[in-house]
Amino acid sequence: ENGLTGTGTQALAEACGCTKANLYVYFKNLDELIIDSTAYCMSKVEDDFLAKAPTDPKDVMRFLEEVPYWTAKKHGKKYRLMYQVYTLPKYLEHGKKFFQGVNERYTQYAKELEPKIGIPYTVITPLIFIFVRACVHYAMFEDEYYLKSQMEVLKQSVLLFLEKYNNQYLKPKDASN
């Protein structure tokens, strides 16, 4: 709830329903607890995000509209904690490692999408990164202007790439004019 501020091992133990001593059965020290807990939490957030990701090309536009708000509501506090942890110089290398994995997983997802929507994964991957960045920024700061600006560029990009690669799956009905 409060990120790292005012959160000690006693509060963490209470939240986990155990004693402080029990925490150290699983973690060598507080740093390991923070690093491992953050990585686990964010892996669950990413799993939720990818579970909502479209598998049917016709769902892409709906996904672009709905997911930023869902992400903010469901995961905003978790994103703020992650950034608080991973931007500390002490944990920066762990953040870099986490995001390297994110890059690999989203690139793999883009490769899986390529045959379904007819756009090369090398084009899809940066679009995913822009989308995720916009979602995370909105989840952390609820900056509607930034979100809408990013979403408009993404939607236009998707339509342009669909036209370029002659894919009819994602075009809205009124975009065919």
Model-derived features: positions:
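Short alpha-helical scaffolding segments that buttress acidic/His motifs in well-ordered protein cores
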Residues: 67-68, 82-86, 128-135
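Hydrophobic alpha-helical connector segments
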Residues: 36, 49-74, 125-128, 151, ...
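Amphipathic alpha-helical packing segments from all-alpha helical-bundle domains
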Residues: 45-46, 50, 74-77, 90-118, ...
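Short helix-capping/turn signature of helix-turn-helix
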Residues: 27, 83-90
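Hydrophobic/aromatic-rich alpha-helical bundle segments in the mid-to-C-terminal region
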Residues: 100, 113-161, 165-177
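Short, basic, alpha-helical segments at the C-terminal edge of helix-turn-helix-like DNA-binding modules
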Residues: 9, 38-46
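Helix-turn-helix
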Residues: 1-32, 36
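Short, hydrophobic secondary-structure boundary micro-motifs
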Residues: 8, 79-82, 94-97, 148, ...
